[in-house]
């Protein structure tokens, strides 16, 4: 009787010891971009779009700013309602201009 009880206790201890707690889930880190860096990115985006669309930078409107895990995107349009997207890397360096 004691042997059955002892064996069942040992099995229970062994099973409890085998269960591992799952590692905590990692959340993506959201780095904040400074306002001055955002303004620099906007000016660079406007300059690139103005050159591409052969117009002045003052006729370019940036309408949206999105942050992704490893990049940034700025959306905008010209006074003729031509849309574009400027892409930047995680450091804020200009990557490319996409016409939409």
Swiss-Prot record:
Subcellular location: Cell membrane
Originating organism: Salmonella typhimurium (strain LT2 / SGSC1412 / ATCC 700720)
Signal peptide segment: 1-17
Sites of S-diacylglycerol cysteine lipidation: 18
UniProt entry tagged with the keyword Transport: no
Pfam families referenced in this protein's UniProt entry, alphabetically: YsaB (PF13983)
GO CC annotation terms, alphabetical: plasma membrane
Membrane protein topology class: Lipid-anchor
Disulfide bonds: none
Name of the protein described by the UniProt record: Uncharacterized lipoprotein YsaB
Gene: ysaB
Residues anchoring lipid (N-palmitoyl cysteine): 18
Key words, A-Z: Cell membrane, Lipoprotein, Membrane, Palmitate, Signal
